[in-house]
């Protein structure tokens, strides 16, 4: 049977959103002992939590996420933005293709000329250590680079063609999804399972086509079951009638075809198993467990060993890239005279696993760890269980100390007086 693909389950999109949720569904904490205020300002000014989620999606379906830093007149903090990896072209060392020396961001822009004809231009930003170079070229109709054009064609005022940044590294930070040793580009989460995605959608479309066909099946039977429509002249069968059948006449009936749908459903199960293997997911990751019980936190982590392992790999890349992004932003601001910029930024990122918290299980663990031989301070327990800023944690510790002080006050005892008694 030949079926047209009219049904798509978008399993790739579900994979990307799953790992983005595990990475940034719970926002990580950025901790700096000496520059916490600057770090918080930088995060708030750039909406970094939302930007990180977009970057995680891009990392999954493009193979890498790309951050770019720049300064904007009138803004105190540097601007960090996520740009499409489709416009990123690395400049690599000829002797080591994985070592990136610079970055070219290039995209096509269009503009109508005086004759109403659309002219294409190639816009490029070339990021090298210590400098940024802005360029614009006119393209021919078949996309060949022609003469160089003035940046004022699109911008007023135009950006400087050559600009010193004061930073010894390019202001572009790349987060690969999975690195390989023969390419500067990362591998996405889809390429290993492309054929399985196609087969899943195709089988579901075939089943849907069969079911649609059998909602209005063809009939067969004797001529006596037909009557002529006076409006159209066609011979039709009226539903809901009784047809008497002569001794030698075939009874009316429906044409039924055994589509072997059970085989299709079994094949879909095998496809899903292959998808789970290729994408490091499973039914539990998509809340498709057949049992009605809800696993606890520890049990859920055991069920999600493979998804969490891939998430940890992604987290390794993001941890390095984000700490580098913060460091470059501080250097850029300091080199261009921004205020309240830290010197050598020491940043630590506290990541979460993205799984729903089990408060009782977490509290029991913390109780064990903080009682007897304490392996965790009360401050750390409050931060992990309740979150909050350092100020709110200090306030909570002060309340705890006050409660303990009240509980340790000396007890007041009343002296018993004997009334009506006289001394001997």
Predicted regions: what is each one?
Residues 275, 289-296, 321, 328-348, ...:
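Active/binding-pocket-proximal capping segment
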Residues 305, 309, 313, 320, ...:
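Extended amphipathic alpha-helical segments with heptad-repeat/coiled-coil character used for oligomerization
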